[in-house]
Amino acid sequence: MIVVDSSVWIANLRGGQSEAVVKLRAIEDPTTILVGDIVLLEVLQGARSDAHAARIERAMREFTIESMLDEGIAVRAAAHYRFLRERGATVRKTIDLVILTFCLERRHVLLHDDRDFDAMAAHLPLRVM
């Protein structure tokens, strides 16, 4: 499965043409796209209105949506934070740690447009698209 980060969804909604957005639009099989619940949260909280949020939600529900955080992921995400900190990689958002750990645990590929994930992938076996 391909986990698509909010950075890509938001850029796509804004009509962006970044490399990640182009890759998202090129995915031929939408059943391979996974939307994490916390990614859905990040995207919806940026909507301009309730009506805009409803349109975005309808569109995103076309893909598989999964919960990304449970007790095990929380513990391993904290361990990843310490591991990365020891190597000088600063993680600015806890949500990114959850997404990272979810992808590592489930062996999913991450499609992102966020430099923080590049720093994490330099130290952990995160598969990125």
Task: Describe the residue ranges of each PLM region.
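Histidine- and aromatic-rich ligand-binding microenvironments
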Residues: 5, 36, 92-93, 114
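Structured helix-beta-strand junction loops
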Residues: 29-31, 62-63, 87, 106, ...
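Active-site neighborhoods of divalent-metal-dependent phosphate/nucleic-acid chemistry enzymes
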Residues: 66-111
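A general structural signal for well-ordered alpha-helical segments in protein cores
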Residues: 21, 40, 53, 74-78, ...
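Acidic, PIN/NYN-like endoribonuclease modules and their adjacent C-terminal/linker elements
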Residues: 1, 104-129
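Short, well-structured N-terminal submotif of metal-dependent ribonuclease cores
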Residues: 1-35, 45-58
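A generic structural signal for short hydrophobic patches within well-formed alpha-helices
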Residues: 9-10, 40-43, 117
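Conserved beta-strand scaffold positions in the cores of enzyme catalytic domains, especially
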Residues: 65-66, 128
